[in-house]
Amino acid sequence: MSAQVILQPSRDKSLRRKHPWVFESAVAELKGRARIGDTVDVFDDEGDWLGRGAYSPHSKIRVRMWTFKKDESIDNGFFLRRLETALALRKRLFDPNKTNAFRWIASESDGLPGVTIDLYDNVAVVQLLSAGGEKHRDKIVWAITKLMPDVHVYERSDVDVRKKEGLEPVTGVLHGQPPTQVTVKENGINIVVDIESGHKTGFYLDQRDSRAAAAHYAKDADVLNCFSYTGTFSCYALSGGAKSVTNVDVSQPALDLAKHHVAINGFDDKRTQYLNKDVFKALREYHEQNKQFDMVILDPPKFVDNKASLNRAARGYKDINMYGIHAVKSGGLLLTFSCSGLMPADLFQKVVADAALDAGRTIKIIARLNQASDHPIIGSYPEGYYLKGLVCEVTDD
């Protein structure tokens, strides 16, 4: 029999709305014994059953809910159903002849809290951020290979958030013989994904729709791609007819791969430049030189790690956007992003607006961009919305 988590009075409302988290402060009592990752049943203070989830004694999120169906066991069949349902949705989203890389499981939004699975052609990269995911690793791999027998599976559970669950970093082969790198297609663009050491699980799949937007706006433009990483925004801009693209990144290996991406997609390397420099420093130098571009892309790393750092992060976003706005020709476009889940969309918009004021310029928002469609947001879990983007016309008016 599973251990039981009893909630404090009046702390059942979020679970009744099917929010997948139970916080430590909501727990009144643990009846029975539960080790890290064990399945527990959750009850309100009057004894009504609310759901079933994974117990994490070291985390402020004490239980991550697997199911709200009383007759649903957390077994092989459970994980198979979750993966099968998620895969069916992804197959509706993409033309496999043009795109063969996507997020298969988006953790809470696909009913598997703390579990991420990204598919890169025939390689599935698994990231387990929760005690429950760790506990059921073998079941998850079994379900992957049941649905895709020819797939190779690699684990990239190497992020700091695992420490909050009392877990150590884990990487390595889980099934088959995955290569170190795999070349995939995204909207017809060839992209090399570094499975073992690339950012996240190897690539920023969540920016697919934003990259397509960049292609749409790039015709005949001189484009500045800041925090360019491996240059996929640049490849999309070139595919959309950009006159030139300048990539700025602090990582020379990333810029080398960006140059390779230009080559394997058949673009003219004479239309590209590569600047190995801190983006803040580069933008300040462009401002001092009065150098401007038709389109500037700002896709910085996450600035907000916790709520306490939000104000500091807002100042960072304001500074980078002010210099980014300086770098846009009058009538040109700024594509700016925040991938910080703790940065509210309205605050991000205010930060960009304040940056424009400080730059002495006017912005007009012409489009909003979000995480790609394979990163869905389930209605009961608004925290799943994390990537915000704005397309702004910049003028001197």
UniProtKB/Swiss-Prot annotation:
Keywords: Cytoplasm, Methyltransferase, RNA-binding, rRNA processing, S-adenosyl-L-methionine, Transferase. InterPro entries: PUA, PUA-like_sf, PUA_sf, RLMI, RlmI-like_PUA, SAM-dep_methyl-trfase, SAM-dependent_MTases_sf. GO terms for molecular function: RNA binding; rRNA (cytosine) methyltransferase activity. It catalyses: cytidine(1962) in 23S rRNA + S-adenosyl-L-methionine = 5-methylcytidine(1962) in 23S rRNA + S-adenosyl-L-homocysteine + H(+). It is an enzyme of class 2 (transferase). Residues 2-81 form the PUA domain. The keyword Iron does not apply. It is found in: Cytoplasm. GO terms for cellular component: cytoplasm. Its EC number is 2.1.1.191. SUPFAM superfamilies: PUA domain-like, S-adenosyl-L-methionine-dependent methyltransferases. Disulfide bonds: none annotated. Belongs to the methyltransferase superfamily. RlmI family. Specifically methylates the cytosine at position 1962 (m5C1962) of 23S rRNA. This is Ribosomal RNA large subunit methyltransferase I. It comes from Alteromonas mediterranea (strain DSM 17117 / CIP 110805 / LMG 28347 / Deep ecotype). The gene is rlmI.
